[in-house]
Regions:
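Class II aminoacyl-tRNA synthetase catalytic cores and aaRS-like
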Residues: 1-598
Length: 598
């Protein structure tokens, strides 16, 4: 039966005692991890969130009832031990433990909670399937690596609170029951009981409210915000997620970015003791696409694109010439020394990879010692091949991979995916490197072939660049935005923009997105109405806290830095949500489900 504390107070966490405290009496509390019964000696690895301390029960030095109680301890029992800190014998020292030189010689024991045999071993090297670990998440979270992840996440939020408070930011909470303004991802809806037929939406971001706070005179806002998006899940996405959300008034783009760079520098120093050099590099969206095929490029390695469109535009190879004539491009990657690394079978596999990104195929040119081997050599002149090799700085031993298409988006996506695959296979993604950069000057709009209309690339409140305002009426697709993303090792960790603060420009923006004036006012009237009462220039940024924590902890999945995550069906395997609710609850909310009718 579980015992009560009855006045016992923990004096130390398990990994806190030091050699300077040898001989001191202390009380430790935690979970029994490893345990060994050697007859007259029992060794328990007592674990809490700080680490593990070996506790030794010596039969010859303990009352009979204490030792017999110790004999009943099994894995994951919750115990409290009163004892004296001692040095281990030299031959018993464990150099792999922070407390490996120490042990607690037990004098008294309380068993505070008993445990059934866990469904998997509570250890970092556990082989249990993730589904099982998520079902018993409260046990999975006891593993040292998971505890370390949660502690690091907590440290990140603490640093954010401290840094932005020092910079004059005010923490303000925004509503989680909001108006549905469908544009982009689907909303999670909450039915109103008191207003039948009406619904709240859970916020996809605090965007509108933080802009309204700027209108309200709070010139620097910060919040650790919970956000919700009803979208198909990927490895790095969850239906509910957390943002470090920020907004500033009376600023331009550089002002926002400079404040964020200070945060990044401090964050990396205090979490990983990594010194980040400022200012961070900046490249435009177009440059990022042209060089890396991605708006969140991994710059830890090269393998940059080489545009050879002008060289091959009139060549005899139809795949190349047609791509250029169709308004697209031909680009290649030069893999230095690639001849030694890749077999023909592997090259064929690369061809299959680019086809998954709608490329028609992969062309290649191999600079072997005995001469050039090329999948398209007979269609090009010697001068054209020579020009390609010179532009790509190719030499003997190198191999070039080409993708051509009449749509640059296909070339970017296909060759960009190949670049990342090559980086992985060649071991170029150094986990000890932290390459931050800003991507700026995004397109204001992106065209949807499926819907036949433009959408806002970021959101409809992003300000166009001043010099592009006239293009809104003449060439909408060429308008650039005052938008900026911060990227780390190929991952977008934050994004923001300078916002529109002119009512006229905001109305024009909605018009260009296909909203009638009535539709815009129906959805966003409370914001547009507020714009009439004096709006300061403002802008901001939001970091994805989950993704940031994943990268800093080097976790393999975003689920490993969230205490109770969902799986790809947006379900919680531990609690069983979402679940069917009682009919009475539905009736009270004036809801009838389609499944009921069927």
């Amino acid at each position: 039966m579980a015992e009560l504390l009855q006045g016992w107070k923990r004096t130390h966490y398990c990994a806190e005692p030091t050699v300077d405290e040898v001989g001191k009496e202390m009380v430790l509390m935690g979970w029994a991890g490893t345990w060994r019964n050697l007859g007259s000696l029992i060794f328990i690895g007592l674990r809490d969130r700080t680490g593990t301390m070996q506790v030794t029960f010596n039969e010859s030095e303990l009352p009979k009832e204490v030792f017999e109680k110790a004999e009943t301890i099994r894995s994951e029992y919750v115990i409290a031990v009163k004892g004296v800190l001692a040095r281990r014998d030299e031959k018993m020292v464990n150099r792999n433990m922070k407390t490996g030189e120490l042990e607690l010689i037990a004098k008294e024991l309380k068993i505070l909670g008993v445990s059934e045999t866990p469904p998997f071993y509570i250890d970092d090297n556990v082989n249990a399937a993730e589904q099982l670990r998520l079902k018993y998440r409260y046990l999975d979270l006891r593993r040292p690596c998971m505890q370390a992840n949660m502690l690091m996440r907590s440290k990140i939020t603490r640093i954010a609170h401290e840094y932005f408070a020092e910079q004059g930011f005010i923490e303000i909470e925004t509503p989680t029951l909001c108006k549905s303004t469908p544009e982009g991802a689907r909303d999670y809806l909450v039915p109103s009981r008191v207003q039948p037929g009406k619904f709240y939406a859970l916020p996809q971001s605090p965007q509108i409210f933080k802009q309204l706070l700027m209108l309200s005179g709070f010139d620097r806002y910060m919040q650790i915000a919970r956000c919700y998006r009803d979208e198909d899940l990927r490895a790095d996405r969850q239906p509910e997620f957390t943002q470090i959300d920020l907004e500033m008034s009376f600023v331009e783009q550089d002002d926002v970015m400079n404040v964020q760079e200070g945060f990044i520098k401090r964050l990396m120093k205090e979490t990983l003791d990594v010194d980040i050099q400022l200012p961070l590099p900046r490249i435009t969206w177009q440059e990022a696409m042209d060089r890396y095929g991605s708006d969140k490029p991994d710059t830890r390695f090269g393998l940059e694109f080489v545009n050879v469109s002008d060289i091959v535009k009139d060549c005899g190879f139809g795949a190349f010439a047609d791509a250029v004539k169709g308004g697209g491009s031909v680009r290649c990657i030069n893999v230095e020394g690639g001849v030694e690394h890749f077999t023909r079978k592997q090259i064929d596999a690369f061809g299959d990879l680019v086809k998954t990104y709608r490329a028609k195929g992969l062309a290649w040119l191999s600079m072997k010692p005995e001469g050039i081997q090329c999948s398209f050599a007979k269609f090009l002149t010697e001068d054209q091949i020579k020009a390609i090799l010179e532009r790509a700085n190719a030499k003997t031993g190198d191999i070039l991979f080409f993708v051509a298409d009449a749509k640059d988006t296909v070339v970017y996506q296909a060759l960009g995916a190949l670049r990342l695959e090559l980086g992985r296979r060649l071991g170029l993604m150094d986990d000890t490197k932290f390459n931050f950069l800003w991507v700026i000057e995004f397109p204001q709009f992106e065209w949807s072939e499926e819907d036949g209309r433009y959408y806002a690339m970021h959101h409809p409140f992003t300000s166009p660049m001043d010099e592009d305002l006239d293009l809104l009426d003449t060439d909408q697709g060429k308008v650039r935005a005052k938008a900026y993303d911060i990227v780390l090792n190929g991952n977008e960790i934050g994004g923001g923009s300078i916002r529109i603060h002119s009512p006229e420009v905001q109305e024009k923006m909605f018009e260009k997105l296909g909203f009638t004036k009535e539709e815009a006012w129906e959805r966003f009237g409370f914001l547009m109405g507020a714009f009439k009462y004096g709006t300061p220039p403002h802008g901001g940024l939001a970091y994805g806290l989950d993704r940031l924590a994943m990268l800093i902890t080097r976790a393999s999945s975003i689920r490993d830095v969230i205490a109770f995550p969902k799986v790809q069906t947006a379900s919680c395997l531990m609690s069983g949500c979402p679940n069917v609710v009682e009919q009475a609850q539905l009736e009270e909310l004036h809801i009838e489900t389609v499944a009921d009718k069927e």
